[in-house]
Amino acid sequence: MIIKGTSVFCEDGTFQVKDVFVEDHKIVATEAEVSDKTVVDANGYKLIPGLVDVHSHGACGHDFCDCDVEGVKEILRFEKAHGITSYCPTSMTLSKEMLVDIFATAKEADGIADG
């Protein structure tokens, strides 16, 4: 896919208008020539890398401390819908046994959330 004319956040901290070539859901080049790939007109939009949420207790009424895989999936769908591509589940001050369960649940849900 080619994303045409989007304002790309660059390494120097500026936005520059570029065409972006995406393959297998990853940016592989900028200023790519238009080909027979799908073209998305992104004129007037900004393109930034996926964001990392380094402190998340949960979302949508769910908390990582609930040890509920379906709840964690809902949290991940919410985060993905808001540009978050990586996260660090944050717990409360709890027993070691409870923390093991919390992070095992997060690991089980990781990569399987729809959305």
Region locations from a protein language model:
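Glycine/Thr-rich phosphate-binding loops of Rossmann-like dinucleotide-binding domains
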Residues: 30, 62, 97
